[in-house]
Amino acid sequence: GMEIIPVVYIVNDCFKAKTKTNPISSDKSDRKSSAETPRQLADKILNRILQMNEANDIGNVKEIQIDCDWTASTKDAYFEFLHFLKEKAKDKKMQLSATIRLHQLSMTPPPVDRGILMMYNTGDVKQLSCQKPILDMKDGVPYIQHLGSYPLPLSAAYPLFSWRILFREGKFVGIMHADDDFPVLPGDSIVVRKPEMSDIMEAVRSINHQNGNINSEVILFDLNTDNIKRFNSEDYEKIFNHRSDSSI
């Protein structure tokens, strides 16, 4: 059967606690007038997840996941939020997981049951000269060298997605998710960046070398129709079977 894990993305600005902002307010003028505590945010997010599960007839949810690009300056507030959310999720018989970006591996692990290691966004998307901004293990290897001693159970997520990136006079304008996201002017350049199967398998092998348990569960992001069609079934078998093949 299919298991659904609700995932909530939270922007890092929500946890910039020094300004006492309201993390979920959409009205910028209201952000300094009503401070919301990490406990209150945890309550609201869990209640919202439960409401959406019920409205969409999604039962037997065993895990919820938080995705946030937290930094050293927001760690305390973010970890406090996770602490409360983990307690509340446990009361509902659910685990709490969180995404772990490569640059976060050198920091204290978040207080969750397990982490999802995001094996992508390794390069600088804003540089036209960067040919592999999504996944290049030349950039990733320095981050994963201490995975064997990382104290949080991890699963790995590998990229299938691609980017269309708009540059103007050699300078980054933005990632084009739709044709009308940005005006395209004469002389602009649109470049497509996407990981090849050889890049993905190199990442899989690198993770195996550091800690094979991480690949006991493999996640591919994201599985829309176009991305799935990029590779054939034999390629996917290589990913999920963790096979090394010198020919790819």
Where are each of the predicted segments found?
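Chitinase-like catalytic core of GlcNAc-active glycosidases
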Residues: 1-117
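N-terminal substrate-binding region of glycoside hydrolase catalytic domains
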Residues: 7-11, 116, 121, 217-225
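Short acidic, S/G/P-rich loop/turn micro-motifs used as interaction or catalytic elements
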Residues: 12-15, 71-73, 122-124, 163, ...
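Conserved phosphate-coordination/catalytic loops
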Residues: 36-39, 131-138, 194-198
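Generic structural signal for well-ordered alpha-helices
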Residues: 42-53, 79-86, 137-145, 201-208, ...
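Substrate-binding surface in catalytic domains of secreted glycosidases
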Residues: 80-168
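Substrate-binding cleft of secreted/luminal carbohydrate-active enzymes
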Residues: 157, 161-163, 168-248
